[in-house]
């Protein structure tokens, strides 16, 4: 959108002396222009030009009218004419730059906009456009307001944080929320750019009695403006910021690669300038950009650098030749450590030096760590090499798919980093710590013996171990929580699994984790996360979310990583989505696909679910229902549906079996099952390969070979202690009965008053790899190729089978294909999950 100064001619008077009537006509032209009345605007500018032919102002106005009409070439000529009359007309240079930009003359356009800024430093539209084009504005930032006294808004004191207030230094326990900002349909770097979104989020976060927001990376200027406004208006409920500096992994584990390291250094300096409101950041792929003019530095609690560094990358760096083992910096030092310890200390020190030298400011700093790289030793864990050797020695076959990164091989130890005497703010340890991963948290008998006020807790035992190691230094749990996903990716002894929780269960577990972090004596916790983010992947589902770049367009309830939000993001319009046990009108609004005198099948789809409703038909108390589902008509599948005493003319890859309210599940044709399932007589390591290599949608069968939707969540392991730990998994196809109002994971419900059997199936259960383009799994080809194909639509057959004598009481053959519309922008709505209120009440009680 083109935004012009309120009074261009008043800002940049033309050289020509024109009659008052010409100036009045120009003013009228701009008023008409801003109201969208282009023809009257053009007429007024033309009248002014006739009264004063040599003036630049009327030509500039007409040029902008032409630009808005899409006539960039004519506009360019008018702007050139205006500048010939007055070369100091900043509006003329701005218009010329915009016209040339639309004509594809980017270099000349940038030159014109830089001329604009040189003439009028505060011409923000020109600055913003230059930054949007990824160009340097040419402006040097104003001198930094460097206080003569050191500015230390926060510091570490023993094992806690303190913040400076009007009353002096006060203890500060972190009650935080991690703010990811990728809305449905957006890539992770496509942040909201409007102030109102961030203002609304910050108000909600503060209302939950949180006191801290953490960012992983630099967000757009709108976030910092919203944070500044919130804190200025709510001094007693101010939000502190933990600012991150993101980094991708370096190539081949070389953290000293000049290009990569230089980019990271520039990003650190950029982050410092951003929080002080003194940055002009040009657009770059994958990054926020813009004019950063909001100074929030007085409420930045700490820096946390980097990401969850992958063990394989740290391992590679530690084994590079001539790695440094010590570091003596101005604010941080390492007497003896690994090259990775030294490198991270150096980066932290460089950021501290930059903020001190430019702004005379210090605050606490840490790098991101997580359990796979903790400095503790875990006997139940083994490296890849160790495990394969232990398998051979114990008579077990090697694992052909042992891709798990070498947890507990290398370590990052914050206790090796020592603040120097010049460090006024301190240093701390920051961990992403969840209760369900890695396995050593849940297999260690010592952790299993731990007991918090909540009860037995491996997680609490692990937190106590972390605190013991970091005695005297704050430990911040910078990520924790469980998701409200239907799918489960890892099981945990106390039931705090990686997924498989409805929203009420999620709330109870997150409250428990929050309490245990405090009881363990840590410096605070930052819950993950503010928002459900659809673009994410977890290891169980990632290979079946294809194309990967389209995951953002649909909501996979089987993917735990997409469902951590306190603010839920849900498919469909608010108030219009069918829910088990909900308004029957919504279910009856779905179109009828097949029908008979006895029963009708209605079908619908949205970015989360396939909806099926049986309308009419025999009651479930006397009848079993089996629905055959064919996601790729013309392919393979089974003709014999389970428990149905007739063979279909069509083939099906899935069978929905509704026996009664306590026994319902989705089955998959064995040939099309992407995962290995337990088989009778198989050995303990039979599930090592994880995937069913050779699964295909094209293999036909009449054997009635159906599998459960079992998936291995915890693989078979052998530890350094030579103890073995059995594989574990879940049957994802078991359907949960009930009302969605009572359980967010309800899959189906019988509404006897309405005569409806209501079912919703998450797309991930049906081997749909991208519902937004109707793409389904075609086959899995060894060693690691997952092929997909576009489905023409789904077909369904319905059998109603009498309970007493197995006779088919009603039959709907597969006929019509259900081809739902594809989409490029998902329809969705949001609401706060119960965990929001649960944490609000807990945090408010402390």
What are these regions (language model features)?
Residues 592-717, 773-803:
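Surface-exposed, glycine/proline- and aromatic-rich loop segments on solvent-exposed faces
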């Amino acid at each position: 959108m083109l935004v012009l100064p309120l009074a261009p001619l008043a800002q940049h008077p033309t050289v020509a002396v024109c009659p008052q009537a010409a100036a009045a006509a120009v003013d009228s032209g701009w008023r008409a222009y801003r109201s969208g009345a282009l023809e009257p605007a053009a007429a007024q500018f033309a009248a002014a030009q006739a009264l004063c032919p040599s003036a630049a102002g009327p030509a500039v106005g007409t040029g902008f009218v032409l630009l808005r009409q899409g006539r960039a070439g004519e506009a360019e000529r008018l702007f050139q004419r205006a500048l010939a009359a007055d070369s100091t007309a900043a509006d003329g240079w701005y218009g010329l730059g915009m016209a040339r930009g639309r004509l594809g003359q980017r270099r000349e356009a940038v030159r014109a906009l830089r001329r604009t800024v040189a003439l009028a430093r505060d011409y923000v539209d020109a600055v913003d456009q230059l930054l949007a084009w990824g160009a340097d504005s040419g402006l040097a930032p104003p001198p930094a307001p460097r206080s003569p006294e050191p500015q230390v808004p926060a510091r570490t004191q023993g094992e806690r944080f303190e913040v400076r207030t009007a009353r002096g230094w006060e203890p500060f326990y972190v009650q935080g929320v991690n703010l990811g900002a990728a809305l449905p349909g957006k890539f992770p770097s496509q942040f909201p750019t409007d102030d109102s979104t961030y203002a609304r989020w910050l108000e909600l976060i503060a209302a939950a009695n949180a006191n801290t927001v953490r960012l992983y990376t630099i967000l757009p200027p709108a976030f910092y403006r919203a944070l500044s406004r919130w804190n200025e208006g709510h001094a007693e409920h101010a939000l502190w910021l933990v600012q991150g500096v993101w980094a991708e992994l370096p190539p081949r584990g070389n953290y000293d690669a000049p290009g990569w390291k230089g980019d990271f250094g520039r990003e650190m300096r950029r982050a410092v300038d951003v929080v002080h409101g003194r940055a002009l950041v040009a657009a770059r792929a994958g990054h926020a950009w813009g004019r950063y003019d909001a100074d929030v530095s007085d409420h930045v609690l700490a820096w946390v650098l980097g990401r969850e560094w992958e063990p394989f990358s740290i391992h590679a760096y530690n084994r590079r030749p001539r790695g440094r083992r010590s570091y003596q910096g101005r604010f941080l030092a390492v007497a003896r450590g690994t090259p990775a310890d030294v490198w991270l200390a150096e980066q932290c020190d460089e950021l501290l030096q930059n903020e001190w030298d430019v702004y005379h400011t210090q605050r606490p700093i840490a790098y991101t760590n997580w359990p796979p790289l903790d400095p503790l030793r875990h006997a139940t864990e083994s490296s890849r090499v160790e495990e394969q050797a232990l398998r051979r020695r114990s008579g077990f076959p090697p694992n052909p798919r042992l891709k798990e990164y070498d947890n507990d091989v290398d370590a990052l130890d914050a206790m090796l980093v020592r603040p120097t005497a010049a460090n006024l703010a301190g240093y701390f340890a920051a961990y992403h710590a969840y209760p369900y991963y890695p396995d050593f948290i849940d297999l260690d008998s010592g952790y299993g013996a731990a007991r918090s006020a909540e009860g037995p807790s491996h997680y609490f035992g692990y937190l106590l171990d972390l605190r013991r190691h970091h005695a005297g230094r704050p430990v911040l749990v910078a990520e924790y929580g469980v998701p409200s996903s239907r799918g489960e990716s890892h099981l945990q002894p106390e039931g705090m699994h990686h997924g498989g929780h409805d929203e009420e269960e999620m709330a109870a577990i997150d409250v428990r984790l929050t309490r245990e972090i405090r009881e363990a004596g840590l410096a605070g916790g930052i819950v993950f996360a503010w928002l459900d983010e659809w673009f994410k992947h977890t290891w169980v589902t990632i290979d079946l979310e294809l194309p990967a770049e389209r995951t953002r367009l649909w909501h996979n309830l089987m993917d735990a990583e997409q469902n951590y939000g306190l603010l839920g993001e849900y498919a469909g319009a608010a108030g219009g989505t069918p829910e088990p046990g909900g308004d029957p009108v919504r279910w009856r609004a779905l179109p009828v696909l097949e029908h008979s005198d006895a029963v009708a099948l209605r079908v619908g789809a949205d970015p989360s679910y396939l909806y099926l409703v049986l309308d009419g038909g025999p009651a479930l108390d006397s009848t079993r229902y089996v629905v055959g589902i064919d996601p790729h008509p013309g392919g393979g599948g089974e003709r014999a549906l389970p428990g149905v005493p007739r063979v279909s003319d069509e083939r099906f890859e899935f069978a929905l079996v509704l026996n009664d309210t306590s026994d319902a599940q989705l089955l998959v044709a064995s040939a099309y099952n992407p995962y290995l399932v337990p088989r009778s007589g198989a050995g303990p390591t039979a599930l090592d390969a994880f995937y069913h290599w050779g699964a295909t949608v094209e293999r036909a069968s009449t054997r009635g070979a159906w599998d459960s939707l079992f998936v291995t969540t915890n693989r078979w392991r052998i530890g350094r202690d030579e103890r073995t730990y059995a594989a574990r998994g879940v049957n994802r196809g078991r359907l949960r009965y009930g009302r969605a109002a009572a359980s967010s994971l309800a899959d189906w419900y019988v509404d006897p008053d309405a005569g409806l059997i209501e079912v919703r199936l998450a797309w991930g259960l049906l081997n749909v790899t991208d519902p937004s383009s109707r793409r389904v799994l075609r086959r899995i080809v060894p060693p690691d190729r997952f092929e997909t194909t576009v489905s023409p639509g789904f077909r369904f057959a319905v059998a109603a089978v009498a309970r007493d004598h197995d006779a088919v009481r009603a039959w709907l053959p597969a006929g019509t294909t259900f081809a739902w519309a594809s989409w490029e922008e998902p329809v969705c709505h949001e609401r706060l999950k119960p965990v929001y209120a649960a944490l609000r009440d807990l945090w408010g009680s402390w």
